[in-house]
Amino acid sequence: MTPHINAPAGAFADVVLMPGDPLRAKYIAETFLDQPELVTDVRNMLGYTGSYKGRRISVMGHGMGIPSCSIYSKELITEYGVKKIIRVGSCGAVRQDVHVRDVIIGLGACTDSKVNRIRFRDNDFAAIADFGMAQAAVQAAKNKKIKVHVGNLFSADLFYTPDVEMFDVMEKYGILGVEMEAAGIYGVAAEFGAKALSICTVSDHIRSGEQTSSEERQTTFNEMIEIALESVLLGDND
C-alpha cells in the first residue's frame, strides 16, 4: 500500500489504462473488462483489475493535472511493478483539421510545467511516448478502421489560462491537442524505467467552442478505449 493507493501487492496488472476521471475508470472496467475487481478507492480514485480477451489489465483514474497523475503513475510503477501506462483522456483542439471526438495518439508532449525540468536538472527533457506502444496503437486503429491523428500534445498547468495568444503559437507548431497530464506521465515513466503512451479524444474545440458534456466524457469515447486495449494485445505479440 501507499499513501494514495490501498491495493495489496500484486493487485495491478503490468499494464494500466489511466483516465483522469475515476468514474471513467469505473465505466471502462465495467464495460470492457471481464470480471473487474475494485482494488483501490482511496480518495475515490478508483482502480480496477480484470481481463480483456484473456489478458490481465488494470484501469485507474489519475485525477487532473501533472501533480496528481505523477503521484499515481509513480506509485504504480515503483510500488506495484507496473511496466506500461496508457493515458486515455480528453483534450481540447486548436487546429481546424482536428475535430470534436477525433482520436489523437500523442507521440510527444510539450508543456509549460516545470516538473520535467526539475527532474532533469533544469535542462529540457523530450517528453515522448514509447515507440513500440505508439506503433501498436496506430496499428490497432488501422485494424479497427478508426481515423487517428498522430503527433504532439501540449500539457498545460492552467486550465483557465490567461495567455490565450498561446493557442495561436500551438496551432502554428502543429499541436494536435491541449490537455494537462501527458508530459508528466512521460517524464515519470522515463525516470523510473517504465513505458507510457497517451491517447486522447477531443472533447472540445478551443476555436469553435464546440464541446461534449461531462456525461459524454465519462461514458463514451469508446474508440479511444478500444484502441488502447487492442494495442496492449498487439504489443504482447511483438
Swiss-Prot record:
It comes from the Bacteria. It catalyses: a purine D-ribonucleoside + phosphate = a purine nucleobase + alpha-D-ribose 1-phosphate; a purine 2'-deoxy-D-ribonucleoside + phosphate = a purine nucleobase + 2-deoxy-alpha-D-ribose 1-phosphate. Its EC number is 2.4.2.1. Phosphate binds at residues 20, 24, 43, 87-90. InterPro entries: DeoD-type, Nucleoside_phosphorylase_CS, Nucleoside_phosphorylase_d, Nucleoside_phosphorylase_sf. A purine D-ribonucleoside binds at residues 4, 179-181, 203-204. It is an enzyme of class 2 (transferase). The active site is at 204 (proton donor). Coiled coil: none annotated. One of its GO terms (biological process) is purine nucleoside catabolic process. One of its GO terms (cellular component) is cytosol. GO terms for molecular function: purine-nucleoside phosphorylase activity. Keywords: Glycosyltransferase, Transferase. The record marks 217 as: Important for catalytic activity. Pfam families: PNP_UDP_1. Belongs to the PNP/UDP phosphorylase family. Catalyzes the reversible phosphorolytic breakdown of the N-glycosidic bond in the beta-(deoxy)ribonucleoside molecules, with the formation of the corresponding free purine bases and pentose-1-phosphate. Homohexamer; trimer of homodimers. PANTHER family: PURINE NUCLEOSIDE PHOSPHORYLASE DEOD-TYPE, URIDINE PHOSPHORYLASE. This is Purine nucleoside phosphorylase DeoD-type.
